[in-house]
Amino acid sequence: MANSPVWYALIPVALVGAPSPSHATQYLSVSQAQRALFPAATVFVDRTLRLTPAQRKAIGQAAGIGPGATQPVWEVRGPSGRLGWLFIDRVTGKHELITYALALDAAGTVRGLEILDYRETYGGEIRNPAWRQQFVGKRAGSVVRLGSDIRNISGATLSSRHVTDGVRRLLATFNQLLRG
C-alpha cells in the first residue's frame, strides 16, 4: 500500500491545497516611523479622523480616489509648537497591503515617506530612498501622478501607482480637514 500508485496520484492534489508562501516584511513600526520622520518631535497627539460621507466625497473628488471611513493621523509637536502631521495609510500593491507613513510639515508639504510593511513578493523597490524622495515638497494641488511627476518602478507598477494615489489622497485629506 505504501508504494501504491494511488499515493503518488494524491501528491499533486495535496500540493494544490497547500498554502502558497507569502512574503511579508515589517521595516518600521509606527513609533519608529514617527521618530525617523520627525526627530525633533516631543509629542505625537492622536488625531484619527472619522470622516463623514460628505467629507469622503469631497476628498474623493479632489484626489480622484476616495478615503475610508477613518484615517489615522497624528499631530506632531515640538518645543516650538506644531511641527506637522503624520499619516499612516494602507494601499493594495498588486495583491497585498502596503503600509506607509507620510509626514507633512505644518503647512501641508510632504517632508518624507517611509514604507512600514511590504507584503508583496516583488516590487519592494518602492522602499528605494530616491523613489520616495520624489514626494518631498509635494502639497495639495501638486500633480502627484505616476508617469507625470512621479517615476514608475518597473516590476512594481501597481505598488508605485497605489502609493502615489494614496499620497495624493492624504494631501487632499489634509487640505480638506487639517489645513488652518
Predicted regions and their residues:
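Intrinsically disordered, low-complexity segments
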Residues: 1-2, 18-20
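Bacterial N-terminal signal peptides that target proteins for export
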Residues: 1-9
